């Protein structure tokens, strides 16, 4: 079977009286800093839209630390330069399942996909700067994410659009392969042997552990396990 869904969302009203100057409701608290929110509810936008600074990149496509687009044109970077950028909610949902039978063999599987959704990589924004590597209070070395060597940020850049990453994915939820044995030993016994893997694999461009996170913020989620099951069913 196959199914596909398209969803489009837009906030149409937040105040009792229409107020074009009302920016919206900040939400989406993140780890790092004090009281930082990375999302906003605004009229004309999707719920929980990311609210960040537009990152500037060098000619090689690398983000430049602390350099953002001055959207307000006032010559400095501040809250007036934050802008709505992408949505954590997928526009497209796909589901796929099927079963194949060949002789006494059978194969079944089920998968699903989300497309056009984005994730704020809070794990990377919190642990991806070089200043965290050496801790003088110990002194000791601390863990940082691998992209710290890619971006070479010396300090935290929590509101950089760099950390809002494509979260589209396809997940194969389970695959089962089985075989039916009939009339074992001539005594009329039947047996089915099957092997199943749950959370078989995932295809995604997301740089974090798993793009399927609540409200589009990846903040140290517990990894989903891959489970292997062997089933033997004997009938007399």
Q: Can you annotate each of these PLM segments?
A:
Residues 1-88, 208:
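Conserved small-residue
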Residues 9-30, 117-144, 203-211:
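Outer-membrane beta-barrel and related beta-rich outer-membrane complex signature
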Residues 4-10, 102-104, 113-117, 174, ...:
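Transmembrane beta-strands of outer-membrane beta-barrel pores
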Residues 1, 95-97, 174-178, 229-231:
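Membrane-embedded beta-strand positions in outer-membrane beta-barrel channels/transporters
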């Amino acid at each position: 079977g196959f199914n596909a869904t398209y969803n489009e969302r837009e906030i149409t009203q937040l105040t009792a009286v229409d107020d074009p100057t009302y920016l919206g409701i900040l939400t989406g608290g993140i780890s790092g800093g004090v009281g930082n929110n990375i999302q906003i509810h605004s009229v004309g936008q999707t719920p929980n839209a990311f609210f960040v600074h537009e990152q500037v990149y060098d000619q090689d496509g690398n983000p430049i630390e602390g350099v953002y687009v001055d959207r307000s044109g006032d010559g400095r970077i501040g809250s007036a330069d934050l802008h709505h950028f992408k949505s954590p909610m997928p526009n497209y949902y796909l589901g796929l399942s099927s079963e194949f039978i060949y002789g006494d063999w059978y194969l079944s599987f089920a998968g699903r996909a989300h497309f056009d959704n984005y994730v704020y990589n809070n794990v990377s924004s919190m642990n991806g700067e070089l200043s965290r590597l050496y801790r003088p209070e110990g002194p000791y070395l601390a863990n940082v994410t691998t992209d710290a060597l890619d971006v070479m940020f010396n300090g935290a850049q929590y509101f950089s659009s760099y950390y809002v990453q494509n979260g589209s994915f396809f997940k194969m939820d389970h695959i089962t392969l089985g075989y039916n044995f009939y009339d074992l030993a001539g005594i009329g016994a039947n047996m089915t042997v099957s092997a199943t893997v749950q959370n078989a694999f995932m295809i995604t461009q997301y740089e974090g552990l798993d793009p399927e996170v609540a409200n589009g913020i990846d903040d140290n989620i517990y990894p989903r396990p891959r489970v292997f099951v062997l089933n033997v069913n004997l009938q007399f």
